[in-house]
Amino acid sequence: MMIDNNCGKEKVWVPNPEKGWINGDLIKEIPGEGWLVRDENGKEIKIEKDELRMQNPVIQEGIDDMTSLSHLHEAAVIHNLIKRYEINSIYTYTGSILIAINPYTKLPIYSKEMIESFCDQPVSKLAPHVYSIAESAYREMLNFQKNQSILVSGESGAGKTETTKFLLQYFAAMGEKGNGVNTSLISEEDIVEGNNIETQVIKSTPILEAFGNSKTLRNDNSSRFGKFIEIHFDKIKGTIVGAKLETYLLEKSRIVKPPENERGYHIFYQLIKGFNNSCCLKNSSNNNKDEDSSSSSNNNIDDLKSLLKCKASDFNYLISSGCDSIDGVDDSQVFIKTENALKVMGLSNDELIGIYKILLSILHIGNIEFEKGKEEDSSIIKYGNSSFGESFSDDDAGGYNPLEISCKLLGCSVDSLKSTFCSRKMKAGNESYTINHTVEQASQARDSLSMFLYSRLFDWLVVRINQSIDKIGTEKKDNSFLFIGILDIYGFESFESNSYEQFTINYANEKLQNQFNHQIFKLEQLEYEKEKIDWSYIEFSDNQECIDLIEKKPLGILSILDEESQFPKSTPSTLCTKLYNNHSKSKNFEKPRFSQTHFIIDHYAGKVEYDTNLFLEKNKDFIISEQVSALESSNWKFLTNLFQILSKKMNGGGGTSGGGGAGGNKASSSAAGKSTFKFTSVSSQFKESLNSLMTTINSTNPHYIRCIKPNTEKRANLFDNVMVLHQLRCSGVIEQLRISRSGYPSRLVYDNFIKRYKLIVAKDFKNDDDSNESKEWNSILKETDLNSSNGGTNNQIELKRKGAELMINKLSIDISSVQFGLTKLFFKSGIIANLELLRSQTMINSATFIQKIWRGYTDRKAYTSTKHSSIYFQSLIRSYLQQLEYNSMVEENSAIHLQSLIRTNELEKQFNQLLSTTIHFQSLLRRLEDSKEFNTLMDRIKKIVKIQSLWRSNLAKKQLKLLKAEAKSLTNVVAEKNKLASKLGDIQSKLDMESQLAQKIKNENEQLSSQFSNIQIEKEKLQKDFGNINLEKEELLLKYSALESEYHQYKQQNELIISKLKQHINDLEEKQHQHSYKNNEVVGNTSFEGSTTTNNGVTSPPKSSPASPIRNSINSNSDTTISGSSDDSIDNTDSLILSPKQHKGEDRKRNHEISSISPPRSRETIGHDDDDNNVDVIPRRQFNELEKEYKELKQMDETHKQYIESLKLQITQLEEKVKKSSSHPRSLLPGIPSNINDSPKVVYTKSSITNDNSSSHHQQQQQQHNISPSNSITSTTSPINMMDSNIKSLSYKDFTNSQEIDAQQQLHQYHLNNGTNPATSTTNGSGNPLSQSSPTGSDKHIQQSTISDLVSALNFNNCQLESGKYLVDLIIKNHDSIVSKYVPSEMGGIPEPAFILSRCFLKNIYDVDATVIGTPNSTNSGGGSGTGVLDPIETNVNILIYFCDKVEEVIYRDPKSNCSALCYWFSNFYTLFNIMETYNQDTKDQLSLNDQDKALIEKLKITLQTMIVKAHKNVVKNITDYIQPILHKSLNDTTSEIDFMDPITNYLNQIQISLSLENCYINNNLCKLLFEQLFSFINAMIFNEILLRKDLCCLRSSIPIKMNISELEHWVKLHHGKEWSSSVCDKLRLLKEVVYILMIDKTQLQNDELRDEICPTLSIAQLKQLLTMYSPDVDSFEDPIPLEILTSLMDSPKYNPDENILLDLSKIFTLKFINSNQTLSSSTSSENDLMATINLNALESVQYACDDLVSNIVKKNIEIVSLNNQKSIKK
C-alpha cells in the first residue's frame, strides 16, 4: 500500500498578509511549477512545492504539545494556539518550551488546589501550565541534585512578571510542604504570613515592581530591568533556605526623561499620592507620645509632610511625558502594599524615611533650571519664576528653591553641589583649571546626579533584599544547598525605530538563543541516543557568528562603540563609518541604502535596523566626582551608610549589576585624580554581567517559558495572528520547531502505534492468512492485546517492534522516513498525518462496508418480509373468493331446500284438512249411532231402578215394625243406661287424672321460673358486690400508698433534723476537743442495734412494736441480705455490681414490692376465683392490719420527736461542758467528711436463703426484735454512737462499711441476684410464702467500690484538687490499655475517662446544692493544711483543664499515637462537651453564678472546644496521611489498574475508626461527620486529579474508578448500616457524574436539558475543563471533543470564567460549635455536627466498679494529710 503524501482532496494553509495564514484546498499539481490551491475566499493561487503547508488532521486540533503535530510549521502552530486560546487554554508546549499567552483577564488556575494537583506529578500526565515547569525543575533538582534555571522571556506586556510571580508562589508552597505542612488542608487565610523566607521571597516582587517597573505604551506594568532570582533549597528536604536577587540593565534614562505618553517608575507616583497613608506617619504620632523619641526623626517626618503636599504636575521629571496615571490603578493603595513589603524585608522606619527623602530629592533636583551666564558658554541656576513647584511657592517667602530643598533633604552643602552643575574641573599635568558648562551641559550634569542617586538607591534596595532573603550566604553556596534560578528579562524587540536599548536587549537574547539552541539540540541528541537511532545528519543552526559580530574583540560592535564613546568629538556618523569599514563583509551585518547613521543586524529572529543617534550618549555613564564627594560628605547618616554598603558590596565582588553603574562606585571614592568625569561603559558592564549570567545558566539545567502578547489593545479574547507569529519567531519557538522538523518530530511507542494503526493493515494480513508473515502478525497482535501497558519485558518490546516493522512494510512507508528506536518509532514530519488520513479513510471505508452489509441485510430482510406478506395477502384474497363462491352455493342449496319445505307444507295442510273433515264426518255418524243405543239403554235402566225402589220400600216397612216392638221393652232401656253411665265415669276419671297432672306440671314450671329469677337476682347482686369489693380494694391500696409515702416523708424530715443536730454536736465536740488528737484515722466500727445508751448518756429511740405479717415477711426476706453490720459478713460475700438497668427506678420497684405481697387466701376465695376467672379478692382483714401498722408508724414518729428533744437537751449539756471543762473529749477527725451519713450506696451481691421454714421464722423474729426499719434508720443516723472511747484510726474501708443500705433496696437486690420477679416471687400458687431454693452454706457478701465511692474518696480529707489531678494522672498513665474501655449505659458505651470526669468533677460544677466544707487546716489549693474555703467551681474547672493539658501533652504530641487511640480521645472530649452543654441547658435557670464563676465555666468550655478541634485535626491528619499517598500511588501506578478501594477499606477496618466512635451512641453525629468528610476528601482528590491529568481523563481510566467507587459505597452500606450511609455515599456524587460523562457520548452535553440531567452537580466551567482534558484512547474509534462543544459551553449564561474549577480540600475537614460564641474553625453546613442528646439522670444512675482508683485515691489523700501534718508540726 503506497502512501501518497498528498492523497485525496486535502486542506492546506495559504499565506495571507493580514491574517498570516488562511484555509485553502489543494486542487491539483502543476508539473514543474508546484501546486494549484484555492483559498477560503475562492481565489486560486500557485504555491511552490517547498512552500506548501499542509493542514493537520482534525484529531490534532488544539493539542497541548505542538511537536506532536504531523505537519510542523508556522501555520500549524498559529492555528493550534488560536484554537486553544479560544477555550482559555493559554499554556501550550512546544517540546520542552512552554508558551504562555497573556489572557488579559484573571483565570482561576492558580489556586492552592492547582498547586497541590501539580505536586509530585510527571509533566507528561498534566496539562501545560507554568506550575508544570516549576514542578519539573523542582523534582529534577532534588532527584539529580543539580541546579535548575527557568528562563522567562517575552516582549513588554506578555506577562513575564506575572509568570515569575506564579513560579515563586509554587516554590514557596513546595518549601512549606518540605517543612511538613499539608498545603491541601490549609485555607488561603492559613497560608503562612510574616517574615519567613517564603513570604519574603514573594514580597520582594512588589518592591522591584515599584522601583523598576513603569507604564509604557505596550504595558501598564512594564519591567524596565532584568532580574535573576535564585531560590535556595535544602538538598534533602527541599525546603527554601534562602534566596538571592541579581538585576540587569536598569533603564536610567526613564528617570529623567520618560518617553511620551509613558510614565517614570511607579514609586514616584505612589509616594506622592500615598504618603499620607504611610505607616511612618502613624509611628511618628506614637513616638510623639514617647518622651525619649528622637527629635531628628520627627523633624524628618515633618519635612516630608510639608514637601509631599504636592502633585505630580509640580515636578519636571513626572510631567514631561504627559502621563501621570494608569487607568484602573490607585497608586495610593499600591503604595501601602509596597510599604508593607518593605517592612516584611526588615526595613526600619528610618530607612523608609531615607528612601522617601532620596526619591523626593531626585524630583526636586529635576526642577532645577539653568539659564545662560554672563560669560560665553556659561550657565547659572535660574531662581524664581520656576516653571515647576507651584505647591511650594506659597509656603516660602523667598520663593521656591529646588536646589536648597534637595540639599536639605540630602544633608549636603548647597555651594558644593551647586558648583558641580555649572562647571567642572580639569587637570593637565600638575595644573588644574575650571571649565564652565553650557546650559545643556548643566542640565546633563543635573540629570546625571538624579540617575546616579536613583541607580544607587535601587542597588541598595537589591542589597537589602538579598540581606533579608539570603539566609545562608554565598560562602556556602557550593556545598549546603541547591538553587533554582528564575530569569525575567526582555524578549527580542524589533520596532520601527530601534535604539541602544533594543540593541542591548537583542544582544542578550542572541546569547540566550544560542544557549537555547544548544540545549534543544542537546535534548534531541539525548533522545536519539537513548533510543539508539542515527542522528548524525540532523542539521543544527548556530547563531554564534552574530554573537561574535557584536562582542568579539577587538573589532566587535561593542568594542568600537566603547572606543567611540571615549572620543569627545565622535558622532553617530563616525561610529557607523567604523562599523561599515570593519563589518561590511559579514553576512549578519548590512548597511542601509539611505542612511549613514543606521546599521542592520541579521538576528536569529530576523533583521533589525538600529538608529545610532543616541548610542554614544546612552553608552556613557558619566559620574561627576565632585557630586559624589558632595554626597559622601553629607551629614545625613543614612546616605553615607548607603554609599558605604554599596562600596563594600562592590569591592567584595558580589555586587549587583542593577543600573549598570557598579563600575562607577569603585572609582567614585578616589576620584580626586585625573578627571572629574569617570567614564564607565554601560555596554561593557552589561556584557560582563551577561557573561556571568550565561555562566550560571550553563551550569544549570534550563527550562524555558516564552510569554506571548496576543494583541496590542490589551483586550481579552482577541488574537492577532501576525503579531503572535512575529513573537514566536523572536522567541525562538519557530527555530525550535525547525530543529525538531529537521529530525524526527513524530514519535510513538510501539504498542500505541500497533493499536492505533493496525486496522489499516488488518485487511492485507487477512487476505494472506496462510503466509508466515500473517501468522507472525496474528501472534504479535494477540501479544499486544494481552499486554496493554506501554512497558513490558525486552522480549515483549522486541515482539512489538517486529509487529511495527511488518506494519511499515505493509504500509509501504519509505524506510528513510522512519527510525526504529528501542521503545519508540520516529517519523519524519507528515508521516503521522498521512497515517491518520489513511486510518480515517479506512474507518470510512469500513463504515461504508458495514453500512453496505447492513443495508443488504435490512433490504433482504425487507424483501423477504414483503414476499411473505404478498403470499399471505394472496392467500387471503383466494380464501375470500372461495368464501364468496361457497356462500353462493350455500344460498342456492338453501333456496332449493326452502322451496321443498314450502311445497311440503302446502301438501301437508291439504292432507290435514281432508283428514280432519273425514274424521269429523265419521264422528258425527258414530255419535248418531251411539245416541240411539244410549236412549235404548236409558229406558231399560229406568225400569230396573223403579223395580229396585219398590223392593227396598217393602224391606223398610218390615224393619220399622220390628223396632217399634223392641222399644216397648224397659229392661233393655235401664241396662243401656247403666252401661252409658259406667262409660261416662271412666271418661270422667281419666279427665281428672289428666287435670291433676297438668296442674302439677304448671306448679313445677312456676317454681322453676321463680328459682331462675332468684338466681338472676343473686347473680346480679354477686356481681355488684364483687365490683364494690374491687373498688374498696383499690381505695385501700391508694390509702396505703399515701400512708406509706407520708411515712417516708416524716422519716426523711426526721433524718434531716437529726443530721443537722449531729453536725451541730460534731462542731461543738470539735471545739471542745480541738487539740486533744494528733492522729487522723479512727479504727473500729460502732454497731447500731436496738435502743442503747452511749457514754454521753444519749438514748436512742425505743424499739417499735412488732410489725404486721406483711412487714415481717418483707423483713424476713430482706434480713438475709441486710445482715451486714459486722465486718465478717461483708468480707465473705461475693461481688456483683448492679447494672445501669438494675439501678434505674429502684425506689419505684421497692414500693411495688410491698403492695405485691398478698396473704394466704381461703378455700372459698380459691373456689370463687375458679368460677370467676380466678379474680383475686383481698380480704378486708389484710387492710385493717395495714391501718394498724400505719398507726404504729405514727407512734414511731412520736418516738422520733422525743428523741429529737433528748438530742436538744444533750446539745445544751455539751455547750455547758465546753464552757466549764478545760480538756476536750475525743471527736471525729477532720478527715471524715461531714456528709458521712449520706454516703454512697454499697452494692451487695448473691446471697442464699435456706428452704427451712424454721430458719425463715427465726429470721422473722430476729427482724422483729432487732432490725426494724425505724431502728435501723435511727441507728445509722446517730453520730453519737460512733464516739467510742477506744477510737484508733478510721480507714476508708471502715468508712464505707459504716454505711447501711435500705431494707427495701436489699429486697430488690435479692430478687435481681436470684433471677426472680419481685411481683410474683413472694407467694406460690396456693398462697403460701415462696422460699427460693439456693445452695446451702453460709451467706456471703462482697463489696465493690463504685463511682460514688470514688467521689467520696476524692472529697476525703478535703484534698480534692490534688487528688483530682492524681486521678487524671492515673487515667492518662495507662492510656494504652484504657483505649478499649467503655462504661455501659442506656446511651451505649461511654468512654471511661469522660464518664469518670463528668461524674467526679463536671457534675460538681453544676450541682446547685454542692458545698465544700473547709476545715481549719484546709487551703485554697486543695491540700490538707492551711486555712480558707475552697471554691468548688474553680477546683473542678482546674482539674478538667489539667486533664485537657495532660492529654495534649501525652497523647497528641506522641508521634506513635494511632488513629484508633486518637478517635477514642476525640470521643472523650466530644462526650464531655455534650455533657457540659446539657448541664448548661438544665441548670441555667437554677444556678446563680458570679462573674468569676461564669468566666471559669466559659474558660472550660473554650478549652474543651479547643481540644475537640485539636483532636479532630489529629484524627484528620492521621487519616489523610495514610489515604492521600494511597490515592496518589493508585492513580499514578502505570503498571497496574487503578485500585484504591482495598487499601482504604483495609485501613479503615484495621484502625476500626467506626468502632472506636460507635461504642458510644452519642457519637453518631461525630461518626457521620468524619465519614462524610473522609468521602468528600476522596471525592475532591480524585476529581481534581481527573480534571488536570490526561491519563485519567479518558474512558480506560473511568472504568476502574467507577468500580472502586461502587465497591467503596457497598463497603460503607455493608459495614455501617446507618441512616447516614446514604448521605456519606452522596459525597461521591460529583465524582460519579464525572465518571459517567467519560463513559457516554459527549455530544449529548450540548443539549441543556440533557446536560442538567446527566450532571446536575457539575458546573459549566468544570465540565468545560473536563472535556478540554478528555482525549480518546489510542485504539478507540471515538473522535476528539469538537471545539464547538467547548465554545458552546463557554457561551452558556451559567459559565463563570472566574470560577475555581478545583475543589478546595482545606474546607472539607471543619467543625462548628452551635452554642458557642467562639469561632475556632470555619463552619460546616450541618448545625448538629457537635450536638448530641444526653440523659443526665441515666448517666448519674450508672454505678461502675473502680476499686483500684478508689484505693489509690485514698492512699494519696492519706499521704497528703500526713505530709501536711508533718509540715504543720515543723512550723
Curated annotation (Swiss-Prot):
Residues 843-872, 866-895, 940-969 form the IQ domain. It holds the Pfam family Myosin_head. Residues 690-712 are annotated as: Actin-binding. Residues 1070-1176, 1218-1282, 1312-1343 are annotated as: Disordered. PROSITE patterns: DILUTE, IQ, MYOSIN_MOTOR, SH3_LIKE. Residues 1077-1111 have a biased composition (Polar residues). Residues 1143-1153 have a biased composition (Basic and acidic residues). The keyword Hydrolase does not apply. GO terms for cellular component: actin cytoskeleton; cytoplasm; membrane; myosin complex. Residues 1427-1695 form the Dilute domain. Myosin I heavy chain is single-headed. Dimer of a heavy and a light chain. Inability to self-assemble into filaments. This is Myosin-H heavy chain.
